[in-house]
C-alpha cells in the first residue's frame, strides 16, 4: 500500500504524460478531440483509470475509445519511461460523464428559474383571501344603542342580566 498522497501525485503525473503522448505520439486518425479530465490510481499503484471527454458525435466517441484501446501499450510504456517507478500501472480509459451531467443539471436549473419567475409573477398579482384586516377587534356596542331599543326590555330578568354583563348602557 502506497501513501494516498503519493498515489494522487502519481495520478496527476500520469494524466499529464498521457495527455502529452496523445497529442504528440499517437497518430491514429480515429482519435478525435480528446481531453483527459481526471486520473485515479489505486493505492497499490498497479492500476490507473483515466477519464476522458471527446468533443463530437457518438461515432467519434466510439472511434476515440477504439483508438485509445489500441494505443494503450504505447501510452503505458511512455508512462513507465517518464515516471521512473518500478511497476508501471495498467491503464484503463473511461468516458467521463461529468460534462453531460453538468449540462443536464444546468438545463434543470434553468427550468426551475423559469418556474420561479412564473410563480413570482402570479404572486405579485395575487390578493389575499378574506378581509384585508383578518384580526378580530373589540365590538363597540355604544353605537348600536338607540331609543328604539328601549322597548326591547320587557322585564325579562335573564336578558337584562346578560345586557348588564355585556356592559350595555341603559338610557
From Swiss-Prot:
Binding partners and assembly: Monomer. Binds 30S ribosomal subunits, but not 50S ribosomal subunits or 70S ribosomes.
Stored Gene3D superfamilies: 3.30.300.20
Gene label: rbfA
SUPFAM superfamilies hit by this protein: Ribosome-binding factor A, RbfA (SSF89919)
Keywords: Cytoplasm, Ribosome biogenesis
Protein family: Belongs to the RbfA family.
Role this protein plays: One of several proteins that assist in the late maturation steps of the functional core of the 30S ribosomal subunit. Associates with free 30S ribosomal subunits (but not with 30S subunits that are part of 70S ribosomes or polysomes). Required for efficient processing of 16S rRNA. May interact with the 5'-terminal helix region of 16S rRNA.
Protein name: Ribosome-binding factor A
NCBIfam families the record matches: rbfA (TIGR00082)
GO CC term, one of those recorded: cytosol
Pfam families associated with the record: RBFA
UniProt key word Cytoplasm: yes
GO molecular function, one term: ribosomal small subunit binding
Chain residue ranges for the region called Disordered: 120-171
Sequence ranges of Acidic residues compositional bias: 143-160
Biased composition, class Basic and acidic residues, residue ranges: 133-142
